[in-house]
Amino acid sequence: DPPKAMTDRLEEVSRLGPHQYPITMGAPNFRQALSRKCERFMGMKYDPETELVVTIGSTEAMVDTIFALTNPGDKIVMFSPYFENYRAQTIMAGCEPVFVPLVPPAFGFDPEVLEDAFRQHPKAILICNPSNPSGKVFTYDELKLIADLCIRYDVYAIMDEVYEHIVYEGHKHTYMSTLPGMRERTVCCSSLSKTYSVTGWRLGYALAPQNIMDRIKQYHDFNTVGAPSPLMEAAVVGLDMPMSYYEEFGAHYAHMKALFTGGMKELGIPFTDPQGTYFVLADISPFLKKGQSDVDFCVEMAQKIGVGAVPGSSFFDEDVNHIIRLHFAKKDETLTDALNRLESLREKIPARG
């Protein structure tokens, strides 16, 4: 659930307003609060007047950024597996995606394969960190390697950092824009959706130097006009939450992760242990019938045991048919019920033999 302070404020705003169009780039008090929050965690200031725009979720921020930085025919590097919207957004802009595989279980990448992609003279690299769907948190050294390539080949970095506060013990989120030479060529796209449990509020944003932000704002203006003014007003209190909120938030997700992955281990279902986010990639190889697709398996699983999953083929450029994505951002009773249902998987969807 969202923080009570935000829902209480939303109730007040529903009576008192604002209810009219905000300024296109976002309400001033919301942008100022967002700038303060980003400075607190990133250690660098983004000017709320010239380097920040409020969007309809991070999805719009990504679309606006891709259109602002590229021309039709340009190439964009992205890692596979990837959030499925990225490919569509890239193609929609008339660009060509260039995929670099992340290799499970740790989802590392081959530096030489990555540089081969940069040798194709892309306009940008698009990175989700922490990563949906793999749960990978890129290390400082990995980001430094990518940053060095961006500088050497004059490439922009488009960062999707919506899971920045869902990182588990032993891992640390590093903002690409904080690396040497990267602030001037990085666009950070994020949202309030995950951090404050308000996915339906659709409050996102982009951070970028002014020369890039001026172009992003133009696309934003003609795409959506502006974010909802009542929701921005209600969310200001959330952006000023004390550090204790983020500590409790992280502990809560660590609890959900332990509950769900612990149950998966007991059931003997192979999966990758996420370093961040709330996703688990499970290996369904033992359950696939000959010729059955992961899509068909997900339909069968939903029908026979009542657990929903996303087919892994949605996220890979490679021919991958044996992985599904599950998520654990649910209440304990829901996760326990899902695990109880998954316990009947071998009975209701017998392993191939």
What kind of region is each of these model predictions?
Residues D1-G57, D64, D240-M241, K348-G353:
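N-terminal small-domain helix-loop-helix segment of the aminotransferase-like
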Residues D1-P3, R185-G276:
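PLP-dependent aminotransferase class I/II
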Residues A68-T90:
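Conserved PLP-anchoring active-site segment centered on the Schiff-base-forming lysine
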Residues M92-V98:
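A short helix-loop-beta submotif of the ANL/AMP-binding
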Residues A93, R152-Y153, L267, I305, ...:
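Helix C-cap/helix->beta junction micro-motif
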Residues L102-E169:
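Active-site phosphate-binding strand-loop segment of PLP-dependent enzymes
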Residues D116, K290-G291, E300-A309, F315-G353:
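PLP-dependent enzyme catalytic core of the Aspartate aminotransferase-like
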Residues Y253-A254, L267-K304:
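Conserved PLP-binding catalytic core of the aspartate aminotransferase-like
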